[in-house]
Amino acid sequence: MRKFTAFACGTIAGLSAYYIQRLNDPQLRVHNSWTNSETPISDCALWNSNWDFRDPKSLVRPLKNDNPQEQNRYNSELEKHVPKKARHIILIRHGEYLDVGDTDDSHHLTDRGRQQAKYTGQRLHELGITWDKVIASNMVRAQETADIILNEIDYDKANVKNCPFLREGAPIPPQPPVGHWKPEGSQFFRDGARIEAAFRRYFHRAYPEQEKESYTLIVGHGNVIRYFVCRALQFPAEAWLRISINHASITWLTISASGNVSIKYLGDSGFLPAKLLTNRIPRDAKNVV
């Protein structure tokens, strides 16, 4: 009996020592910190509520004092600037295209790209959305994609807006850098300012007078869409190249009345047949490999 007791005590002591040692394992302490509510939030994780410079509080003259009359004035002005409804922005990447020739005029959709656009149009039709605006990049491949989509949805082609700000480009040097794609620094300065201007033009909370949720369809390009996603969600903009989206895919972002932004779809292409899934220019049709 004494031997059994000694054995049991030794076993318990050994297990206790092992457990205490495991608790002090630095790797486990790091894992525990991920769920520790007392851990300070990183500055880069904090949400900027005035990201679009349209936070109602930023549009109203601040309180001068605590007088009831002044508070009534402030609250009355604030109410006039508060949005009531959400905005939905649906981004479509153009279909597969041929990169032949030196100008955009020769960059037409492939047969597969046209099929992709048709499926996307049918998918948008199935969603039953009533479109408030349709906007397209003025590059040929985006124009052709938009034209095919418009054959499938209920929207007057005469009301489509063509926007040069949405043209494809190099928005910002990516992190981590990649060896196969190194635009000149001047291209980032030129394209980056334009693409950022496009973001500010189309991404903002609703106007106070908007009485119903709105739906805006934008047909554009892979780099621009990925940059928009990072900016809208307040992720580091340099992370845009870590995201991959297929041709003719659907990305859906919602800007709530409060200004909070959420993503519903990111590069959704599950409605396309497997044989139509592509995300790069056909290798035999590229000017530069």
UniProtKB/Swiss-Prot annotation:
Q: Cross-referenced SMART domains, in alphabetical order?
A: PGAM
Q: Which compartment or compartments is the protein found in?
A: Mitochondrion outer membrane
User: Keywords, A to Z?
Assistant: Hydrolase, Membrane, Mitochondrion, Mitochondrion outer membrane
Fetch the CDD domains from UniProt.
Answer: HP_PGM_like
Q: What is its main location?
A: mitochondrion
Annotated EC:
3.1.3.16
Any idea which GO molecular function terms this record carries? phosphoprotein phosphatase activity; protein serine/threonine phosphatase activity
Read off the Gene3D superfamilies from this record: Phosphoglycerate mutase-like
Reaction(s) the record says it catalyses: O-phospho-L-seryl-[protein] + H2O = L-seryl-[protein] + phosphate; O-phospho-L-threonyl-[protein] + H2O = L-threonyl-[protein] + phosphate
The answer to keyword Lyase applying to this record is: no
Report the enzyme's class at the first EC level.
hydrolase
A GO CC annotation given for this chain: mitochondrial outer membrane
Q: Which example biological process does GO assign this protein?
A: protein dephosphorylation
Q: Which family does it belong to?
A: Belongs to the phosphoglycerate mutase family. BPG-dependent PGAM subfamily.
Q: What does this protein do?
A: Displays phosphatase activity for serine/threonine residues, and dephosphorylates and activates Pk92B kinase. Has apparently no phosphoglycerate mutase activity.
Q: How does it assemble?
A: Interacts with Pk92B/ASK1.
Name listed for the protein in its UniProt record: Serine/threonine-protein phosphatase Pgam5, mitochondrial
UniProt organism field: Drosophila grimshawi
